[in-house]
Design a protein with these regions (language model features):
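N-terminal capping segment at the start of a domain
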Residues: 1-26, 83, 249-259
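Extracytoplasmic/secreted proteins, especially bacterial periplasmic and envelope-associated proteins
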Residues: 4-11, 23, 27, 31, ...
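A non-catalytic alpha/beta surface segment that caps or lines the substrate-entry region
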Residues: 7-65, 211-213
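Second-shell loop/turn segments in exported
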Residues: 14-24, 44-48, 85-94, 121-122, ...
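Solvent-exposed loop/turn segments at secondary-structure junctions
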Residues: 19, 42, 49-51, 64-66, ...
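Structural recognition of the beta-strand scaffold that forms the well-ordered cores
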Residues: 59, 76-79, 118-121, 147-152, ...
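Acidic/histidine-rich catalytic neighborhood of metal-dependent amide-processing enzymes
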Residues: 85-195, 222-225
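Active-site-adjacent substrate-binding region
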Residues: 163, 167-283
């Protein structure tokens, strides 16, 4: 698994910005679509207008077997953004999330499923969540229901050093001071989904430490809990959770030129992918 992850990361890590590196952004889009096809997913694109141009969310759809499809629940979304800010290669933010998502897709394509899984690589997350807002809005406009969205946002950096983990002010729960856990962030409406993920992770990936934070409303009282695509789904009334290493509250390379492959914990990314896969098969 480490070899596949490393291959994904090497292909994806580079600045992927809509203005300063559009070719690299398109290359990432093409790579993700090709990886979806390689593991047998049906590929489609959700195009949206933004920043004076057209951008695309890349969707890979995995349906349950024909017999199960007639009894299927609404779809589950597994998402990660593929753009970066300027002047960073974006290893943790967010090639790590993409690699975990692609690894989960590879693990699930022959699994027994009770619902459709949509793997969505979103674009322009770093530009006010434009891609995920456009997609969530399209779901609501079509009156489409989903089981929920699991958003992978910076899942590749760990530290065993005491004091390596910090937290935003006014946190309602105690946060460990060692940055070796996966954060699970949900709002109240998404708490059942988040607790199900937490229980599944503990059962199936025992060496993956997790910390669950549930915030009221849409996280308005703790703005740092709204900093990824899960907030777009909250906005349109859908359950969603963010899985994260907590970004700048742990990773000193966040949004810097030093956010490189060498700083990542591939074993941790593997465990996150295992937990996401286990969640999808347990529904």
């Amino acid at each position: 698994m480490d070899d596949r992850l490393r291959s994904h990361l090497r292909a994806l890590i580079s600045e992927r910005h809509p203005v300063s590196s559009p070719v690299s952004l398109r290359r990432a889009q093409d790579y993700i679509a090709e990886e979806y096809r390689r593991v047998g997913l049906r590929v489609s694109f959700h195009a949206f207008r933004a920043l004076g141009g057209t951008y695309k969310n890349v969707i890979g759809t995995l349906r349950p077997a024909r017999a199960a499809f007639h009894r299927a629940k609404p779809p589950l979304i597994i998402a990660a953004h593929y753009d970066t800010i300027q002047d960073t290669p974006g290893a943790d933010d967010n090639a790590s999330g993409l690699a975990a998502m692609l690894e989960a897709a590879g693990r699930l394509h022959e699994a027994s499923l009770s619902c459709e899984i949509r793997f969505i690589a979103t674009c322009l997350e770093e530009q006010d969540l434009l891609g995920s807002v456009a997609y969530a809005a399209s779901l609501r406009e079509a009156n489409e229901e989903i089981l929920g969205a699991i958003v992978l946002e910076c899942v590749g950096y760990t530290s065993e050093r005491e004091g390596s983990q910090t937290a935003p002010p006014a946190m309602p729960i105690a946060i460990p001071r060692v940055g070796d856990f996966l954060g699970i962030v949900a709002n109240t409406a998404s708490a059942p989904l988040a607790k199900s993920f937490e229980q599944t992770a503990k059962r199936e990936v025992a060496d993956l430490k997790t910390v669950l934070l549930v915030v009221p409303g849409q996280g308005e009282q703790l703005p740092d809990t709204r900093r990824s695509d899960h907030a777009a789904f909250w906005q349109f009334g859908y359950p969603a959770l963010m899985l994260t290493d907590t970004a700048n509250f742990r990773n000193p390379h966040y949004h810097r030129s030093t956010d490189t492959l060498e700083t990542l914990d591939l074993s941790f990314i593997c465990r996150v992918a295992q937990a996401v896969s286990a969640m999808a098969t347990s529904l």
